[in-house]
């Protein structure tokens, strides 16, 4: 499981160096093979270990092409998906089209999300996080039923 927030720098070639605690897990879980694609709701990228992505991709491919929203989702997620290899130093090259989509230059934030990571431009992450905290404070009484019994 991947968790935690890490502030990182992309190097001059656009490579992301995964923190060592995640690097070891990626190398043992999927031999460092990951898939990066866009998040179609936010301007960030999503990184999945290859086995996780293959399961998602199977589900996406099974969606009906004649349904416009399903076809759009497939185009965005599968169309932007790139297989990446984490090298021995724990780095993976983030392809230029993906960096451009998410507005990634140097300062980035890597967010562990259980079975995947999100990669954000640092300033956009700080802005969105502040927005979400504000929204959460305003909507506290409106928790979905599934969350009402969760003690945090």
Swiss-Prot record:
The keyword Transmembrane helix does not apply. It is found in: Cytoplasm, Nucleoid. It holds the Pfam family MraZ. Gene3D superfamilies: Transcriptional regulator MraZ domain. GO terms for molecular function: DNA-binding transcription factor activity; transcription cis-regulatory region binding. InterPro entries: MraZ (IPR003444), MraZ_C (IPR035644), MraZ_dom (IPR020603), MraZ_N (IPR035642), MraZ_sf (IPR038619), SpoVT-AbrB_dom (IPR007159), SpoVT-AbrB_sf (IPR037914). It comes from the Bacteria. One of its GO terms (biological process) is negative regulation of DNA-templated transcription initiation. Residues 5-52, 81-124 form the SpoVT-AbrB domain. GO terms for cellular component: cytoplasm; nucleoid. Keywords: Cytoplasm, DNA-binding, Repeat, Transcription, Transcription regulation. Forms oligomers. Belongs to the MraZ family. PANTHER family: TRANSCRIPTIONAL REGULATOR MRAZ. This is Transcriptional regulator MraZ. It comes from Halorhodospira halophila (strain DSM 244 / SL1) (Ectothiorhodospira halophila (strain DSM 244 / SL1)). The gene is mraZ.
